[in-house]
Amino acid sequence: MPTLRQPDGVLSVALSHSVVSEYRECDSLPDIDQRVAHALTMEVMLTPKPGLVDRANNGAHRDMDVALFQTSIQAISPWFRHFTDAGYQHANIPLAQLLSQVRPIGIACEQAMLSATKGVNTHKGGIFAFGLLCTAAGWLAGRGERVTQRSLCDSVAAMCHDLVRNELETCSGAATAGEHLYQRHGLTGARGEAASGFNTVCQYALPALQQAIAAGADNETALLRTLLVLMAHNPDTNVVSRGGMDGLAFVQAYAQKLLVGPLDRQALIKMDDALIARNLSPGGSADLLALTWLLYHYPAE
């Protein structure tokens, strides 16, 4: 297990300088913490995003805005290097055993977020998804394997193979919102998406983003269209927790409608108004959009 210490008030993974510098020079892992910060910043600044915090408004949220997201990103970004460090240090153990090794880092990262935001959950889903991805990247680099979209997603799937069974199927009581939604609707949420190797991202979002950019769309237009693709296909538990299965059906059908033809920003603004009126926030899709943007910058295979 990583040795956790508290230098200058920040929890970190204790690794020898030689080991850390060895893999930080790998071409496949340059400044991964900065890459994550860029992806998270891209997501919050992208506008207009129906129901979500952006530069135009706070979406269906009363307790957060762009400034709070930026504060949160600044607080959590250094931790993603710790996930990568831990993956590299434990490259000699099977992926199935790796999740338990990085849980303390995830908990500490969440605490850093909550401390910075005064208790507001801005990035819990992002910490979970990007923490897994960074751990996988370090593990692959430590084994001398290529870091690609496929190897990253396959590694996360192997890490989380038993996550749904261990934390949802065998749960005797609904202690968390995710457990409640699984028991009531059979939705596996972020755990299921990770256990699938981010299947929604790989099957829908990445192809949509690649196709849009290949067709000449600018990054913002391509990302907005990709967000609609995610909203149309992702069984977003953030939406269900606010609006039930009817709310999810509303979001998915609305997104599908807007995907017919070129991207219409005025139609996106109207969708934003509709989701705000119904208090629906597709936060799970927002997390997956940021993840898609990060993965897009790695080779496919």
UniProtKB/Swiss-Prot annotation:
Molecular function GO terms recorded: ATP binding; triphosphoribosyl-dephospho-CoA synthase activity
Entry EC number(s): 2.4.2.52
Catalytic activity: 3'-dephospho-CoA + ATP = 2'-(5''-triphospho-alpha-D-ribosyl)-3'-dephospho-CoA + adenine
Keywords, comma-separated and alphabetical: ATP-binding, Nucleotide-binding, Transferase
GO BP field: prosthetic group biosynthetic process
InterPro entries: CitG, TriPribosyl-deP-CoA_syn_CitG
One Pfam family linked to the record: CitG
Family: Belongs to the CitG/MdcB family.
Protein name: Probable 2-(5''-triphosphoribosyl)-3'-dephosphocoenzyme-A synthase
Organism: Pectobacterium carotovorum subsp. carotovorum (strain PC1)
